[in-house]
């Protein structure tokens, strides 16, 4: 194998990355540094430390990145009202650039000459991790075991773990039949019965949300306060970004909000079915569009909507650290200077309903928009010239005998 002295491994403590840890030690005869990120996945991360220590790891990083994740990645993404292919709120995609960033930082701190991850050769995550790594440290070596080894089934991974005395749970607690990924923004489910696109997902699959049918019969109202496009308070109580999202996840989950069952187009070329729970993100998206509806200029809002699919695609395909994403982000952030105010929402059985919005920076003028007497604020006769000028090119074409079809 290539000359590698030290590798930083993105380590969850689960079967796959525990096998990768031992495989790296044996295959590359190198020192391994483990990095475990707490992104609000709801699982205890400290057991990863004990497992890594038992496998001889001397340098172990377990970082609480929840605030950085929401403040520097989730919130900037939501300023753009970002949705991939009309539905997906990019919960997995947006977490990968932060993990890649921290992998490189640790590699620099520890003098490691390589990083490694547990993403398979079929998915998007390998691209996201590695594009980020190369953008931040061009000369870094990336080791992707799933593209090198022959352990291509869970059973082979289990056998390898037993052979090398890697602590695992072959028996005991029932394992989920789905491949799952979770952080503060969402939880995803893939595989199992979901690989048949006609088979309905099972109700007991969902972990964060109740079914809309079983949600409370009484709606709940929320008020979200925005400053420069970001939520800063919930029902008048100021909160940190991570606390905002965690609170909205809890409340939204209680009302059956944020379930999604989609087939998406992966960057590597295949279609993949996934189910997602994004209760807080679903609320945030609806509320942000509502506050923008009264604070953004029409053409700015329309331009943002035109650019959003490109921005979403850049995040989905791993180009968070690219110059084009950074350029778009500057434009998006500039549009949020006046996105301030309060949005009132009603949550009811899976629905997020906007019931009010107000802002000192509002462009809504009731005197002009009213259906009642406006006192001369708007001269309706002006509309005639406006319409004629906008119709001019079509009138010319018709006068020239141009056929429409």
From Swiss-Prot:
<feature type="binding site">
    <location>
        <position position="118"/>
    </location>
    <ligand>
        <name>ATP</name>
    </ligand>
</feature>
<dbReference type="InterPro" id="IPR024074">
    <property type="entry name" value="AS_cat/multimer_dom_body"/>
</dbReference>
<feature type="binding site">
    <location>
        <position position="88"/>
    </location>
    <ligand>
        <name>L-citrulline</name>
    </ligand>
</feature>
<dbReference type="InterPro" id="IPR048267">
    <property type="entry name" value="Arginosuc_syn_N"/>
</dbReference>
<feature type="binding site">
    <location>
        <begin position="10"/>
        <end position="18"/>
    </location>
    <ligand>
        <name>ATP</name>
    </ligand>
</feature>
<keyword id="KW-0055">Arginine biosynthesis</keyword>
<dbReference type="GO" id="GO:0000053">
    <property type="term" value="P:argininosuccinate metabolic process"/>
</dbReference>
<keyword id="KW-0436">Ligase</keyword>
<feature type="binding site">
    <location>
        <position position="188"/>
    </location>
    <ligand>
        <name>L-citrulline</name>
    </ligand>
</feature>
<keyword id="KW-0963">Cytoplasm</keyword>
<keyword id="KW-0067">ATP-binding</keyword>
<feature type="binding site">
    <location>
        <position position="276"/>
    </location>
    <ligand>
        <name>L-citrulline</name>
    </ligand>
</feature>
<dbReference type="Pfam" id="PF20979">
    <property type="entry name" value="Arginosuc_syn_C"/>
</dbReference>
<feature type="binding site">
    <location>
        <position position="179"/>
    </location>
    <ligand>
        <name>L-citrulline</name>
    </ligand>
</feature>
<protein>
    <recommendedName>
        <fullName>Argininosuccinate synthase</fullName>
        <ecNumber>6.3.4.5</ecNumber>
    </recommendedName>
</protein>
<comment type="pathway">
    <text>Amino-acid biosynthesis; L-arginine biosynthesis; L-arginine from L-ornithine and carbamoyl phosphate: step 2/3.</text>
</comment>
<keyword id="KW-0028">Amino-acid biosynthesis</keyword>
<feature type="binding site">
    <location>
        <position position="128"/>
    </location>
    <ligand>
        <name>L-citrulline</name>
    </ligand>
</feature>
<comment type="similarity">
    <text>Belongs to the argininosuccinate synthase family. Type 1 subfamily.</text>
</comment>
<dbReference type="InterPro" id="IPR001518">
    <property type="entry name" value="Arginosuc_synth"/>
</dbReference>
<feature type="binding site">
    <location>
        <position position="124"/>
    </location>
    <ligand>
        <name>L-citrulline</name>
    </ligand>
</feature>
<dbReference type="InterPro" id="IPR018223">
    <property type="entry name" value="Arginosuc_synth_CS"/>
</dbReference>
<feature type="binding site">
    <location>
        <position position="120"/>
    </location>
    <ligand>
        <name>L-aspartate</name>
    </ligand>
</feature>
<dbReference type="GO" id="GO:0005524">
    <property type="term" value="F:ATP binding"/>
</dbReference>
<dbReference type="GO" id="GO:0000050">
    <property type="term" value="P:urea cycle"/>
</dbReference>
<feature type="binding site">
    <location>
        <position position="37"/>
    </location>
    <ligand>
        <name>ATP</name>
    </ligand>
</feature>
<dbReference type="GO" id="GO:0005737">
    <property type="term" value="C:cytoplasm"/>
</dbReference>
<feature type="binding site">
    <location>
        <position position="125"/>
    </location>
    <ligand>
        <name>L-aspartate</name>
    </ligand>
</feature>
<dbReference type="InterPro" id="IPR048268">
    <property type="entry name" value="Arginosuc_syn_C"/>
</dbReference>
<dbReference type="InterPro" id="IPR014729">
    <property type="entry name" value="Rossmann-like_a/b/a_fold"/>
</dbReference>
<dbReference type="Pfam" id="PF00764">
    <property type="entry name" value="Arginosuc_synth"/>
</dbReference>
<keyword id="KW-0547">Nucleotide-binding</keyword>
<dbReference type="GO" id="GO:0004055">
    <property type="term" value="F:argininosuccinate synthase activity"/>
</dbReference>
<feature type="binding site">
    <location>
        <position position="264"/>
    </location>
    <ligand>
        <name>L-citrulline</name>
    </ligand>
</feature>
<comment type="subunit">
    <text>Homotetramer.</text>
</comment>
<feature type="binding site">
    <location>
        <position position="93"/>
    </location>
    <ligand>
        <name>L-citrulline</name>
    </ligand>
</feature>
<dbReference type="InterPro" id="IPR023434">
    <property type="entry name" value="Arginosuc_synth_type_1_subfam"/>
</dbReference>
<dbReference type="GO" id="GO:0006526">
    <property type="term" value="P:L-arginine biosynthetic process"/>
</dbReference>
<feature type="binding site">
    <location>
        <position position="124"/>
    </location>
    <ligand>
        <name>L-aspartate</name>
    </ligand>
</feature>
């Amino acid at each position: 194998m290539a000359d590698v002295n030290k590798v930083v491994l993105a380590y969850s403590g689960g079967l796959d990355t525990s096998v990768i840890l031992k495989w790296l030690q044996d295959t590359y005869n190198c020192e391994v540094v483990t990095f475990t990120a707490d992104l609000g996945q709801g699982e205890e991360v400290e057991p990863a430390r004990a497992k890594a220590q038992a496998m001889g790891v001397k340098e172990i990083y377990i970082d609480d990145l929840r605030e950085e994740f929401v403040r520097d990645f989730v919130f900037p993404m939501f300023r753009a009202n970002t949705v991939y292919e009309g539905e997906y709120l990019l919960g997995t995609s947006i977490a990968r650039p932060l993990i890649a960033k921290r992998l490189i930082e640790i590699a620099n701190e520890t003098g490691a000459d390589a990083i490694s991850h547990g993403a398979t050769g079929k998915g998007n995550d390998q691209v996201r991790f590695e594009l980020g790594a190369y953008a931040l440290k061009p000369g870094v070596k990336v080791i992707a075991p799933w593209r090198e080894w022959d352990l291509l089934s869970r059973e082979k991974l289990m056998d390898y773990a037993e052979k090398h005395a890697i602590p695992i749970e072959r028996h005991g607690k029932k394992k989920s039949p789905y491949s799952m990924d979770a952080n503060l923004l969402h939880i995803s489910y893939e595989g199992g019965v979901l690989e048949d696109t006609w088979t309905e997902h099972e109700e007991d699959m969902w972990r964060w949300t109740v079914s809309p049918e079983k949600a409370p019969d009484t709606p709940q109202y929320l008020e979200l306060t925005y400053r420069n496009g970001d939520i800063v308070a919930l029902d008048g109580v100021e909160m940190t970004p991570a606390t905002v999202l965690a609170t909205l996840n809890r409340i939204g989950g209680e009302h059956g909000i944020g379930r999604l069952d989609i087939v998406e187009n992966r960057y590597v070329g295949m279609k993949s079915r996934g189910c997602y729970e994004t209760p807080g993100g679903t609320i945030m998206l609806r509320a942000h569009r509502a506050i923008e509806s009264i604070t953004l200029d029409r053409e700015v809002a329309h331009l943002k909507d035109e650019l959003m699919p490109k921005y979403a695609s850049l995040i989905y395909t791993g180009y968070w650290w690219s110059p084009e994403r950074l350029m778009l982000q500057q434009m998006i952030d500039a549009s949020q200077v006046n996105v301030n105010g309060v949005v009132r929402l009603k949550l009811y059985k899976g629905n997020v309903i906007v019931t009010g919005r107000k802002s000192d920076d509002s462009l809504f003028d009731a005197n002009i928009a009213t259906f009642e007497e406006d006192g001369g604020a708007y001269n309706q006769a002006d509309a005639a010239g406006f319409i004629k000028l906008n119709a001019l090119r079509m009138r010319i074409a018709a006068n020239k005998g141009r056929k429409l079809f």
